[in-house]
Amino acid sequence: MNISTDEMYNSHSRFIHKKFIIHFSASETLEVTKSDYLVQSSILEESFKLSDSPFGEVTSNELALTLFNEDGLFNPANNKGKYYGLIKKGIKIEAFIKVDEVNDWDRFGVFYVTNWVANSGGISASVTAYDILYNVINGSVPSFPVYRNVNFNEFMKDYFEYFNITDIEVDASINWIIPYAYTSVYSSNKEFLSDLMIGALADCFCNHDGKIVIKSKSSNRDLRATLTDDDQIISMSIKQTIDTDYDSVNVTCNVGQESSEQALLSISDMSVSIGNNASGKLVLNSQPALSIKSIKTEGNNAVTVRSFNASANEFECILRSTTVTNTSLDVFGTVLEIVSSNIGKLGDAPLNIDSKYIQDLSKANEILKYAEDYVKASVPTLEVTVRGNPNLQLGDKIVIESDFYKISYTGIIVKAEYKYIGNLSSVLTLIDASALKEV
């Protein structure tokens, strides 16, 4: 037997092994296990940041390691240590887990170091790392042109390719043509992705293979597993239902339209020399730009535009001049204008949903129905402490069947925290599957 099965992870006689491969460089790796340096570890996974709304911020999974710092081996300042100069941010760490009776390891996430602390003379080193989404969330927002009537899947491929990520998995049930797709008005990638996932009715997270997954909130899911008192359940708690917070839903629909021609950029005095002059990237005054209609230059001598390139928020060009002079540069074009309206009922405590990616009434009504069903479902969020089954992933549908707690609950895993201190335990957070109105 080479695969760790659910039955093996459920067994009361199980013995679990965990290992981490730390890639200090292309040629220098270290395998960390219970018998070699590993003191304890924890992994926190979330499909979205839980809040009092069915939608939440996109987040990244976290790994925390405590290593036995023998002879200062893992002290970044120890210039006599084997890994001196190699301990830095961005180090790749692969996590694996298995039961004793099998040979093959199950993947349990891919992470990249953000913090490594080992006090001088201390006996342990603390390492914090996050999955690849952390780099996306904390990276610069791409400067794309506005995409018109683009397929969601294609837009996501282009977006993640900007971060050199080509292997993503998009739920095939998300068949969405976005009227206007753009990034330029967002201050961060977390803000952009969280806003986009509202429109997509989806969650964005990393699975145990380290792959970015975009999964529909409302697509049909097969039952993955049943957890019972006999095999997994240790304890549980039930959070109040969302309907106690809200009595209605209000959705803002942000319909885009192309503006009339207007000035996008105006520079009154630009120095140019003989030959070709690169303007560098210039920030447009009006955003997001849809099209460039005309470019004008003026000066004492003829200055011509050889070429230009524009995104939704930036413009750059090559100006050709026959002499050293000053010129003005005026760029004219159209921008995306937004006309907003609200649908739904305004009660005393409405759940307000507003996303730039709710761009037509059809999408607004789809989200309104989803949110109203969720609010009206009167279903709890369940937090259950279990012995832990690493075969389960975020987004899996499972049944919690407990005679002791007198509950039968079918839920979707939206958060999982695994702790390993010689053995494995886990806390799963589930939202009721009936509230998702699967199709």
Regions found by a protein language model. Name each.
Residues 1-8, 127-129, 136-145, 219-234, ...:
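Acidic, low-complexity/disordered segments
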Residues 1-146, 158, 162, 181-184, ...:
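Assembly/oligomerization scaffold segments
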Residues 2, 36-45, 137-150, 186-199, ...:
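Surface-exposed, non-catalytic interaction/assembly patches
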Residues 41-66, 251, 346-379:
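Short beta-strand/loop turn elements enriched in aromatics
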Residues 61, 109, 123-125, 210, ...:
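Envelope-exposed proteins and targeting segments
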Residues 68, 132, 148-171, 357-361:
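Glycine-rich, acidic and aromatic/proline-enriched surface loops and short helix-turn segments
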Residues 86-88, 106, 145-153, 185-190, ...:
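Solvent-exposed, acidic/flexible segments
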Residues 119, 164-173, 198-213, 304:
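Short, well-structured beta-strand/strand-turn elements
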